[in-house]
Amino acid sequence: MSARGKARSRALDVLFEAEQRSASAFDVLRARREKTDQIVNPYTLEIVEGVVSRQQAIDEFLETYSQGWSLERMPSVDRIILRIGTWELLYNDDVPDGVAVSEAVALAKTLSTDESPQFINGLLGRLQQLKPSLLA
């Protein structure tokens, strides 16, 4: 797994834990740093900050274009993967669109249900098509 792939996976862990514990993602990051004394990958921090700062808009896009799936109905891990993928796709110009989608699908293949990769690919693919109008 690439350094950015590991950073995505760690960001997913942080965001997932924060959601499950109803805690701040930054508190989760801080607690992890204190426990391990490890330096947090800068890209992990960038993802967490980006998703947290844009979560309302990201969730609105996901809710609007998920066709019959509310955020609450989605498995938690899928919801977090979609938030990361949407942030990379729409708000991180350093990541090519295709990479954002394929990395999100790869996380889903590893961490979620058999149906999740196809769902995530379809939803992020739709957002990719609509990207110019979504950011206008």
Curated annotation (Swiss-Prot):
InterPro entries: NusB-like_sf, NusB_fam, NusB_RsmB_TIM44
Any one of the GO BP annotations: DNA-templated transcription termination
GO molecular function: RNA binding
GO CC term, one of those recorded: cytosol
Top-level taxonomic group: Bacteria
Gene3D superfamilies in the record: NusB-like
UniProt KW keywords: RNA-binding, Transcription, Transcription antitermination, Transcription regulation
Protein purpose: Involved in transcription antitermination. Required for transcription of ribosomal RNA (rRNA) genes. Binds specifically to the boxA antiterminator sequence of the ribosomal RNA (rrn) operons.
Family: Belongs to the NusB family.
Protein name, as recorded: Transcription antitermination protein NusB
